[in-house]
């Protein structure tokens, strides 16, 4: 009988612990360009708090569509300010905040292209047959790259060479695997360990990317989400963001 009672107590304790742990989580929708720093940030946050962080990485436009269709995210970290603001105006999110500022660069794994001077000369180089640009309709970094191309009157002349992956992380992977010769990508990708396998060129004409986030109204564990949002602006996280070229 004593063993049976102890068993029941252990079972109840396990059930209580499991229930508590299940509620201590943050479900984040994160723009693909921020994937590398976010993984480090989440790992550090989890090590300091009894909260698990689950992330989905995709283009900002794709994630916005999921949120509007009822996806159970707690927080949205976009690659622009417009989408979080739109969600807030629709009553789906709290007031937006800025969590990072990023830049577009041109990246290549091809050593011969690394010797060329300037991104404009690289994309016009005879050996460049395919150029990865994240879909401008759903990826803010792709839209910014198009601004730079248009300013240099290169968009129309290079149109046949463009390949449009859905998000900026995929665009980088295309060039990394040499499925394309070059890629317009986030500086964070160029500064990653994989990015060091090639070289990158500054694209000064591309507007800076101001990245906004928001806490969604359907967030379940609001206390955990609040902790995470505060953590995003901590000196430790700022150091991680700076390492990947964000301000």
Question: Which positions does each model-derived feature cover?
Answer:
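Positively charged n-region of N-terminal signal peptides that target proteins for export
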Residues: 1-4
């Amino acid at each position: 009988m004593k063993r049976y009672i102890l068993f029941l107590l252990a079972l109840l304790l396990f059930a209580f612990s499991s229930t508590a742990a299940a509620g201590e989580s943050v479900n984040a929708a994160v723009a693909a360009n921020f994937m590398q720093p976010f993984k480090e940030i989440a790992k550090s946050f989890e090590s300091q708090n009894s909260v698990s962080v689950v992330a989905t990485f995709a283009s900002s436009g794709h994630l916005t569509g999921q949120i509007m269709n009822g996806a159970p995210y707690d927080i949205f970290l976009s690659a622009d300010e417009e989408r979080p603001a739109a969600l807030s105006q629709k009553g789906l999110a709290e007031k937006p905040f800025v969590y990072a500022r990023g830049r577009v660069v041109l990246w290549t794994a091809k050593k011969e292209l690394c010797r060329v001077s300037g991104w404009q000369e690289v994309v016009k180089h005879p050996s460049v047959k395919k150029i990865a640009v994240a879909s401008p309709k759903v990826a803010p970094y792709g839209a910014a790259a198009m601004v730079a191309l248009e300013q240099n009157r290169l968009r129309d002349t290079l149109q046949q060479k463009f390949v449009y992956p859905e998000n900026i992380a995929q665009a980088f992977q295309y060039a990394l695997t040499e499925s394309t010769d070059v890629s317009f990508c986030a500086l964070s990708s160029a500064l990653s360990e994989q990015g060091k396998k090639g070289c990158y060129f500054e694209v000064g004409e591309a507007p800076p990317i101001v990245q906004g986030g928001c806490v969604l109204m359907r967030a379940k564990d609001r206390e955990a989400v609040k902790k995470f949002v505060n953590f995003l602006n901590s000196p430790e996280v700022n150091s991680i963001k700076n390492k990947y070229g964000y301000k």
